[in-house]
Amino acid sequence: MSETNVDSLGDRNDIYSQIFGVERRPDSFATFDSDSHGDISSQLLPNRIENIQNLNVLLSEDIANDIIIAKQRRRSGVEAAIDDSDIPNNEMKGKSSNYILSQQTNIKEVPDTQSLSSADNTPVSSPKKARDATSSHPIVHAKSMSHIYSTSNSASRQAKHYNDHPLPPMSPRNEVYQKNKSTTAFVPKRKPSLPQLALAGLKKQSSFSTGSASTTPTQARKSPLQGFGFFSRPSSKDLHEQHQHHQHIQHNNINNHNNNNTNNNGAHYQVGSSNSNYPQHSHSISSRSMSLNSSTLKNIASSFQSKTSNSRKATQKYDITSNPFSDPHHHHHHHHSSNSHSSLNNVHGSGNSSSVMGSSSNIGLGLKTRVSSTSLALKRYTSVSGTSLSSPRRSSMTPLSASRPVMSASSKKPQVYPALLSRVATKFKSSIQLGEHKKDGLVYRDAFTGQQAVDVICAIIRTSDRNLALLFGRSLDAQKLFHDVVYEHRLRDSPHEVYEFTDNSRFTGTGSTNAHDPLMLLPNSSSFNSGNHSYPNSGMVPSSSTSSLNSDQATLTGSRLHMSSSLSQQKNPAAIHNVNGVFTLLAECYSPTCTRDALCYSISCPRRLEQQARLNLKPNGGLKRNISMALDDDDEEKPSWTSSVSKEDWENLPKKEIKRQEAIYEVYITEKNFVKSLEITRDTFMKTLAETNIISADIRKNFIKHVFAHINDIYSVNRRFLKALTDRQRSSPVVRGIGDIVLRFIPFFEPFVSYVASRPYAKYLIETQRSVNPYFARFDDDMMSSSLRHGIDSFLSQGVSRPGRYMLLVKEIMKSTDPEKDKSDYEDLSKAMDALRDFMKRIDQASGAAQDRHDVKLLKQKILFKNEYVNLGLNDERRKIKHEGILSRKELSKSDGTVVGDIQFYLLDNMLLFLKAKAVNKWHQHKVFQRPIPLPLLFACPGEDMPALRKYIGDHPDCSGTVIQPEYNTSNPKNAITFLYYGAKQRYQVTLYAAQYAGLQTLLEKIKQGQAAIISKTEMFNVTKMSDRFFDYTNKINSVTSCDGGRKLLIATNSGLYMSNIKRQQNKDHRHKSSAFFSTPIQLVQRNNITQIAVLEEFKSIILLIDKKLYSCPLSLIEAEGNGTSFFKKHHKELINHVSFFAEGDCNGKRLIVTAHSSSHSIKYFEHEHPLLAEKNGSGSGNKKSLKKKITEVIFDSEPVSISFLKANLCIGCKKGFQIVSISQNAHESLLDPADTSLEFALRDTLKPMAIYRVGNMFLLCYTEFAFFVNNQGWRKKESHIIHWEGEPQKFAIWYPYILAFDSNFIEIRKIETGELIRCVLADKIRLLQTSTQEILYCYEDYRGYDTVASLDFWG
């Protein structure tokens, strides 16, 4: 074959390889003369085109001839344009213009982003994929995408080397590459996700693509980020081109070793320079899935610098083998070619030389930019700086915890790494002191001032430069960590500016790493195998997809190991915020060659100013962005009064009058701006949200109703107010005054009160929609970036701050108003000022109440009860959260200040609540840790032990829960606090620990205040001691009753019957109150076990129950002279035997005595006969049955436990429920209707019904466990509550609107209608003695063992 044919065949093969990506196989059919086809007759032509013989050869030959002729014409012209510094001369001749187009075409440089059509959609299980994965060979460099779209010289060289040097044989699958210091190993890189800070800029570029990406062959499971196009795998064509380029690199190495004798002992290795024999390329196996412009790359590079100067200098002094990231054991691949080996040795030079990719490469849309030696995309993961070649050299590494900001004015180590916004934000939230601050007349709770914020940031980043701290704070403000309470401006270093956290969350869980943190994507495996290569001691998962901006694999591996150890050693404290990013002013340069004395190549290096100062260089201005500011369209109104009128109108006025006119004009101009903002809110926000689907249709109406509540009312009033001000302002250049206008419109400002009160809930709705509704979040962001320059929060907050501005504006006018000259206006302004003060007070009250109510509602949504539900009364509109904080079940060590307690407590105005946060399916649930403790039953003591409560409880009659001090004055170094729940059914004691002693003292003080407030609200219950130190444990009081019009008291005890006189006297402390006391009791009858007593004064009889026998005795016993025991024996009458207890009362117009008999499950009742009637009927005094009529007995199926009197019937409480007994019909039936399914809880046999009371047209049934309402048909009242007792009461008393339940340890006082516990009176062994309309008598045992009689006086 001739030389021409040889060249033609080579060009054909070259073209075929470039088009199809594989080597053309030899022809398997015989060739023929291409010119002879013209002689073929039409009769010999086949009917189908696919049947034409050798059609493919004919077409390819014609195409090849056209291309070859075009190339030969342009070959001489293109050769002159080749860069001699990049490619050797012997390779340039005749190989530079391998265009595959017959006509000269200008090809525009396009971004090297994979399109949807070029994405590799081959299934993972395809054999083709397996061949691609196994055919990958370790190479020194991989081509960047810039060479794919480069000039033809690279294509020519590529084709030549592909034809001259076939692919080497594949390595065995189990082959392990030997480690060698002198060879450069390249590990296939895993493509990390782009930094979050750069994603926003990338998405705005037209070249940003999120094409479908398949999983890597070595990893069958799909990565979480591959669905977003962050990870991609190369196509088969890319892998084939990598082998071609590998051979191309080896051929260049041979030529460099033979023809170039340059001694490379310098400190830098420059790719693409005149001294380098390597072509331009970056480290990439496949094409990038993202395209970056220069500004985005600059932002990424400047945002992820993480190395300090001191640590860099220290680590660079280490030996080569001391760095684990540059250790030869980390290089897992090397080349088999000795030529490549020697060439690399020649290039690298000495082992301590620093290597930097200093050349320019085409990135994105053809923009020239520097390629860093370290992957920019990895800067968020690590602080390790590596080189672009994995040669054995030192690699500096700086842990995050050891970083120090360059600009810090203090030499102390910062508390956290100041460049990471997330860590500083977490420390900021835990360090800032929240409190109440006032702005524009409104009080904001859980807020802080701008000066406080700057102080805390200065302390965190260890700097005295407040401007730097202010810039840092505004970075946190920009990411919505906190905001101005009125959304007017950014952070300011002022004690008068008030800010609050954006989340305003009261629920802070335990510290944990965010599941969405990109750091969690790092693998933690120690070794793995992939394909036919082994990766020992590596924490990296190999992947065929990579980024063209990645660094060497040693850096990646080292960074992963470093960050994995950092994650295992450092626990991020509780930080519920979305702040993320890098503060570049405090970050360190990522370049390993950047020192304090050498100018860094990067223009955005943080040390650049310092380096320029050291080198005496003049700083260059650099490129500047042309920022176009949106101008206000309304330029009609002048900013000041003097500019709005002519100079002749004000030049002769005194300065005080000018100042007054400026203040009046400010009222007018600010009111106009406020009305304009209301119009924008109405026309832009309300209308858009109402007419579009930004808010879902099911909640749209409710959202607009509450978020924009009272906007139209305010606009209606202020529009007329503005019109009045406008007319006054235009009536004369010099306004005489506006006091009358302000005073006239203040009564119409009432919608502001309702508007301010609706803001907490409106803010909650907005934040909820912003977090769950991406359309609403985008809408709000679009409004902020539009000409409005403010979001919905800013516009809605103006209505909150406007009433306070009125006060400030009126006050400013009064300062400049002469009381003598402008007397009328000054008086109007004074009246308006007083009216505005009252108005602001009502706004503060409404705002505070609304905020309290909103906080309680949020708390109600979070609470989850583990076992028994407890009614916390959170539906009460008056419920408030007094204090909250975090405690721990374990002691917090002094050294570990970042440990967060696991118990969240909430001190309400009625009880103390403990919650424990737990994350379930990414939702923070707050489970009740212990049963909530009502404040009247709460005892708190600083320390780990609770003193004995007997002397505290029995010391005074009105004892209730309180804060007590330990018995011994010992220190409390552990900051422990012990809580005791003084309940009957749920008594428990728990000890928790506070982080700080001040927090412990604050909690105890808040508990004291809450308990004192409860007692002050129930002053109508006067608990006084009437008798003590007489009845000891051998002579217990069983029952008492009053007689002689309440002046005498009969006391039944275990040893007999006593009588005492009741005396009253004025209280010295409160003259309008009187206190009662008993005289020394006198024994009337000496009989043992008198368990119950009753006096029937109208029948002049005393009823006694002695040893289960019911006796009657004349009332004259109390006036009998001499021994009362003998008088009782002579005049008493035995009525009934085997009586468990009895009761007397009026029923159906009769005075009945009812006795209960437990043994026979029955009751007996009879009517007591008047003694005078008995004497008239001739009954003798010795007749035993003279005082009673016929005895009626009613038998039940269970034991009777209580007796209650209704108007016409008896209600007997049996163990199986209440039974109604008809006196007239002598029959009984169940009170509760079993047809009511809502009463299943009250139909248990274990319940003990104790009392029934008529309340209106309903009946209150009291059991030992609970109480509830039923109607006269025995059905439960609809939507009625159930009162659950804290104790197990045996007796009840009612004093509307309160119900009193007597347990042996305390008395519960509750509201009948709501069941709310308002007061508890604590004592030991309490027994109810007597109830009346004025007072209740009960007795208890004091700490000395004496029975003490006390009175609950309702009238006082």
Swiss-Prot record:
The keyword Acetylation applies. One of its GO terms (biological process) is positive regulation of endocytosis. Residues 74-94, 109-175, 202-291, 303-362, 383-409, 531-571, 626-645 are annotated as: Disordered. Residues 235-244 have a biased composition (Basic and acidic residues). The modification Phosphoserine is found at residues 76, 193, 223, 566, 628. Residues 329-338 have a biased composition (Basic residues). One of its GO terms (molecular function) is guanyl-nucleotide exchange factor activity. The modification N-acetylserine is found at residue 2. Residues 250-265, 282-291, 339-362, 383-401 have a biased composition (Low complexity). PANTHER family: RHO1 GDP-GTP EXCHANGE PROTEIN 1-RELATED. This is RHO1 GDP-GTP exchange protein 2. The lineage of its organism: Eukaryota, Fungi, Dikarya, Ascomycota, Saccharomycotina.
